[in-house]
Design a protein with these regions (language model features):
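Boundary/entry segment of secreted carbohydrate-active catalytic domains
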Residues: 1-38
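Short, acidic/polar
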Residues: 12-24, 71-91, 146-153, 231-238
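Distinct, well-ordered alpha-helical segments
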Residues: 18-22, 44, 143-158, 179-189
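Aromatic-lined carbohydrate-recognition surfaces of secreted/lumenal glycan-active proteins
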Residues: 129-148, 191-209, 244-255
Length: 301
């Protein structure tokens, strides 16, 4: 029987020997990468990567001034050459490729602020589509955006090819609806005629969500438990996802420095084998009818 549920994948900060180990052992169906190596074209074929998501690190320039649309255009100009090189490298690969909008975990406290971020996402997606890319919008942090505010993001969902956000939890505390499995709650707030594109959880795993330890330093390896215990939690996490979730990428592979060392997936046979055992294709059983996508022009450059 064909396996159901979201694709299982990895989040890659940098392509290191550690990343190589995980790619070889896990052969993940899904990869999100911040590393723009043209070698991804080879890896997609060699490891049978079905969906490839790529994002430019732009946390140093996330301001929406002088306007959201102008901010999107500024970031597009900044990275246009890299976008073009990567697009050329990936042109003949069999994977579905998404460009994720560059704003990372931007907290929007009010519906008006979220609407401004939606406006920026809309403009970025327009530029991506014109250049021949599919695009994901969102890239929100765990617990964000607030469920009641989510309808303000409708304009971005209406143009996007997918929606992304991050979900973390603490050992034994998935807290579905609060820390994890939020896509169903978010989508339930939307008008009936609003597009509900496939959801990708583009960062996930055990972390210090509750803030009881120093931030950003307590991944799954920080807890004195066997790797198999993490696999049990990853399994429960994947199984709890609503049918609109197409895939999830576990944080993290490849790190320069030590900040994210406790999240590193390399050298964990149990975790790699769990990734390898996941479905190779996602079947949309959400019941959300996506309107026919407009023909996306292919860039001639």
């Amino acid at each position: 029987a064909k396996m159901s549920g979201p694709l299982r994948g990895i989040h890659v900060n940098a392509w290191t020997t550690a990343t190589d180990w995980t790619l070889r052992r896990a052969r993940p169906a899904l990869v999100k990468s911040l590393d723009w190596s043209p070698d991804w074209a080879r890896a997609i074929r060699e490891y049978d990567i079905r969906v490839f998501i790529i994002r430019k690190w732009a946390d140093d320039d996330s301001s929406l001034v002088p306007s959201p649309a102008a901010a999107a255009e500024r970031l597009w100009r900044r990275f246009a050459a890299d976008f073009g090189r990567m697009q050329a490298a990936l042109a003949d690969t069999p994977a579905t490729v998404y460009l994720e909008t560059p704003w990372n975990e931007v907290h929007q406290e009010t519906p008006d602020q979220l609407a401004r971020l939606a406006e920026a996402n809309v403009r970025f997606v327009e530029l991506a589509h014109t250049a021949g890319w599919k695009a994901l919008v969102g890239n929100f942090s765990v617990t964000w955006p607030l469920v009641d505010h989510f309808p303000a993001f409708v304009p971005a969902l209406a143009v996007a090819d997918g929606y992304s956000h991050h979900e973390y939890w603490m050992p034994g505390q998935l807290l579905p609806g609060e820390w994890t499995a939020r896509a169903g709650l978010l989508y339930a707030t939307l008008p009936a005629d609003c597009p509900r594109p496939p959801v990708y959880v583009t960062e996930c795993g055990i972390d210090n969500v509750a803030g009881t330890r120093p931030p950003n330093q307590y991944g799954w390896r920080s807890y004195p438990r066997p790797d198999a215990a993490y696999v049990v939690e990853l399994d429960a996490f994947a199984a709890s996802q609503p049918p609109s979730v197409a895939g999830l990428t576990v944080f993290n592979c490849g790190e320069v420095g030590t900040r994210w060392k406790s999240f590193e997936l390399a050298e964990s046979g149990p975790v790699a084998d769990w990734l390898a055992a996941g479905p190779r294709e996602w079947e949309d059983e959400s019941g959300h009818e996506m309107p026919p996508a407009e023909e996306v022009p292919v860039s001639k450059t």
